[in-house]
Amino acid sequence: MSAASASAAVKQKVEAPVHPMDARIDELTDYIMKNCLWQFHSRSWDRERQNAEILKKTKELLCGEPVDLSTSHDRCYWVDAVCLADDYREHYPWINSMSKEELASLMQGLKDRMDYLTITGSLNEELSDKHY
C-alpha cells in the first residue's frame, strides 16, 4: 500500500456503530447488501437520503404507521420500502413478533449500520467528488 493510500485509509477511519441488536441488524444488512440496488448510488448525499427515507418508510410499514406519500420522491422510496418490509416479514419471521419500540430501535440500528458501510466507513473517494 502506498503512503498516500495508507494516509487516505487512516483519514477515513470511522468506527462501526454498536447496537444491542447487532446480530439481527447483521441479518437485515446482509439482505440489503445482497438484494437492494439502491445502496449503490454514486454520491454520499444520495446514499444518505436513500438510507434515511427507505429505512424510515420501512419502519413505518413494519410498525403499521401512516406513510407520507405526498411527493414523487416519497412514493419512489415507498416502493422500495414496501418490497423491503415484505421481504423482511417473509425471510425473518422474528421481526413479526417485535414491539413498535423494538422495531424502531432495530431500524435505527440498521440505518446507522448502512450509513457506516455505504458512506462514513467507505473508502470510495467518488462519494465525495464534487464533479461527479
From Swiss-Prot:
Pfam families per the UniProt record, alphabetical: AnfG_VnfG
UniProt keyword Signal present: no
Any one of the GO BP annotations: nitrogen fixation
GO MF annotation terms: ATP binding; iron ion binding; iron-sulfur cluster binding; nitrogenase activity
InterPro entries: Nase_Fe-Fe_dsu, V/Nase_d_su
Cofactor(s), names only, from the UniProt record: iron-sulfur cluster
UniProt catalytic activity: N2 + 8 reduced [2Fe-2S]-[ferredoxin] + 16 ATP + 16 H2O = H2 + 8 oxidized [2Fe-2S]-[ferredoxin] + 2 NH4(+) + 16 ADP + 16 phosphate + 6 H(+)
Superkingdom as given in the UniProt entry: Bacteria
Role according to the record: The key enzymatic reactions in nitrogen fixation are catalyzed by the nitrogenase complex, which has 2 components: the iron protein (component 2) and a component 1 which is either a molybdenum-iron protein, a vanadium-iron, or an iron-iron protein.
Protein name in the entry: Nitrogenase iron-iron protein delta chain
Species this protein is from: Azorhizophilus paspali
Encoding gene per record: anfG
